[in-house]
Structures are given as C-alpha cells and as structure tokens.
Amino acid sequence: MYFKRYLQLAKPGIIFGNLITLTGGFLLATHREIGFEYLPLFVYVMIGVALMIAAGCVFNNIYDKDIDSSMTRTQNRPLVTGDISVIQATIYGTILLILSCLVLYYLVNLLTLWIIIIGFIVYVGIYTVSKRLTIHATVLGGISGAIPPVAGYTAVVNILDYNALALFLILFFWQIPHSYAIAMLYIDDYKKVKLPMLPIVKGIACTKKIMLFYLALFVVSCALPAVLGSADLFSFIVCMLVALFWMYKSIQSYRTDTDRVFAKTVFKFSIIVITAICLTMG
C-alpha cells in the first residue's frame, strides 16, 4: 500500500514519458545503437534522470497540495488523502534528488547532471509557481520538458551542440499543443482552482489556433536532425511522416469536430507521434 502511494507521488507516467524522449536523444548520439558498448551508460542515465524527474514530481505535489484537493482528477493523490505527510514527502523528494545527483555525477557526466538540474529548477521553481500567476506557465514548463532528450544526447557525447538544440526544439514545440490539449480537456477543474490557463483567459478558439501554430513549428523542427547531418534518411522519413500526419489529423479535427474532440485528437496523436519519433531517432 505505502510503496504504491510513494510510487504514485513520483508520477510514474510522467517519468516513463520523459524516459522515452531521453531515449530519442541517446539514440541520435549513438546512431540508433544500444549494444554492449552503450548499454551500461544508457541504464545509468535512465536511472539518474528518472530519479530527478521523480524528485521534481514529488516537490510539485507538495506545492500543489492545496489546488489538488479541489480538482476532481487529483483528489486521490497521496498528499491530499493524507496517506503521505508533507514531511515524509519532503524527505522522499530530497532522497530522490540526492541519489539522482550521485548517479549522474559518478556514472554519467557532469554536463548531463547540470542539464538535468536546470530542468528540475525550471519545473519546480518556475513552472510550478508560475502556473498560478500567468498564462505563459505552459511555455515555461516546456523548457523543463524539453530537457530529457538533451540529457540523453549529452550522456553520450558530453557536449552541447546544434544537435542538442534541435532535440530541445522538437520537444519544446511538441509540448505546447500537447499541454494545451490537456488544459482544454480539464478546463472545468482548472476553473475551480482559478488557474490562469490559456483556454480560460484567452478562450478556446484562441488556444486552438496557438496549438496549430506550435504544431507547424514542430513539423519544421523535426527536419533539423537530418539537416544537421546527424539523423539518417530512415529517421528523417519517419519523423516527417508522423509529424505531418499529426498536423493533418489536427487540422481536420479543427475544421469538423467539437472543441473537446479536437483536444482529444491532438492529445492522442501527440503520444503516438513523439514515441515513434524518439524510438526511430538516429
């Protein structure tokens, strides 16, 4: 029971999703090869980054305890129900943070550690606080969400270059329509706690147009690894096909479907698209 509640506090779904994008960066750096040469490093960076993301999610839960208690989809979180206390959660999050730093420093490299720490700070210190204050919090949160593939890349090459920037842009532009789709689907919950989400402040129509704008930027960014010469033809074709397919389905839904169906369409295909792109990167 308690193990399950502590696991829920770390948001395993978010961890898993971020590890998929990390894999994309790792595969780009190794040209889609994870053999005996790279397998230990791959395991180490996965563990280190997973621990840091888990720590960030724990501290996010602590800060959001008050609004989580008022939203239907978050009312059963461990801190809200009292299964885990704030003190216990703080200790848990701190242990995860320390373990992550140790793994990344000793078993990966210092650059990757610093990159992941930046992601942690942006997520916990900037995004978590700013989402109560500004409609731009989702964009700020996109910075932290775009960090894992960069970390996967630097774990191998130990440098920041244009390929790392390309990975960052792909994930950053992907996250905005993905996140706004979630905001549209749970708009009633966000209204309850008076969070200034874009669909609430600017309206659904404006949000949908912005989602399509970022989707177009995402499609363009998917060509960058190939343009830079780091991704092969197979990766380029897969990336462009799935990105264009997502764009097509979203525009089609925008023209014909209700707002909720549009949000569901964008969200559903966002998961399929980013998984396909990350697992064929290289």
From Swiss-Prot:
Lineage: superkingdom: Bacteria
InterPro entries, sorted: Protohaem_IX_farnesylTrfase (IPR006369), UbiA_prenyltransferase (IPR000537), UbiA_prenylTrfase_CS (IPR030470), UbiA_sf (IPR044878)
One annotated GO biological process: heme O biosynthetic process
Catalyzed reactions per annotation: heme b + (2E,6E)-farnesyl diphosphate + H2O = Fe(II)-heme o + diphosphate
Transmembrane residue ranges: 9-29, 39-59, 79-99, 102-122, 139-159, 165-185, 210-230, 231-251, 261-281
GO molecular function per UniProt: protoheme IX farnesyltransferase activity
Any one annotated GO CC term: plasma membrane
Pfam family membership, one: UbiA
EC number: 2.5.1.141
Coarse class of the protein's main subcellular location: membrane
Keywords: Cell inner membrane, Cell membrane, Heme biosynthesis, Membrane, Transferase, Transmembrane, Transmembrane helix
The protein's role, per its UniProt record: Converts heme B (protoheme IX) to heme O by substitution of the vinyl group on carbon 2 of heme B porphyrin ring with a hydroxyethyl farnesyl side group.
UniProt cross-references to HAMAP family, sorted A to Z: CyoE_CtaB
Family designation: Belongs to the UbiA prenyltransferase family. Protoheme IX farnesyltransferase subfamily.
Miscellaneous: Carbon 2 of the heme B porphyrin ring is defined according to the Fischer nomenclature.
The protein's name in its UniProt record: Protoheme IX farnesyltransferase
Originating gene: cyoE
